[in-house]
Swiss-Prot record:
This is Citrate lyase acyl carrier protein. It comes from Streptococcus pyogenes serotype M3 (strain ATCC BAA-595 / MGAS315). Keywords: Cytoplasm, Phosphoprotein. The gene is citD. The keyword Phosphoprotein applies. It comes from the Bacteria.
Amino acid sequence: MDIKQTAVSGSLESSDLMITVSPNDEKTITITLDSSVEKQFGNHIRQLIHQTLVNLKVTTAKVEAVDKGALDCTIQARTIAAVHRAAGVDQYDWKEIDSWNV
């Protein structure tokens, strides 16, 4: 999926995550994370976001995530929504997403 514009999903409420996805001039995926549980779960959150991007066939993006204790399912849902918005895609392939076994 080609990232065309900046898009945001989520909120800064407790147990949520705000994720911003933008085009990346460096042609790589870069993930910046701000989390109160960085030491315990930072690597896991980054891996989860990265794997979701790979599953969505995103090859280049700048991702900024602010985590407020979100569960894995919330992190994935927010990432999926932000990527679709940033790509200008309004149709979700639920069969494909379901095949990820999340």
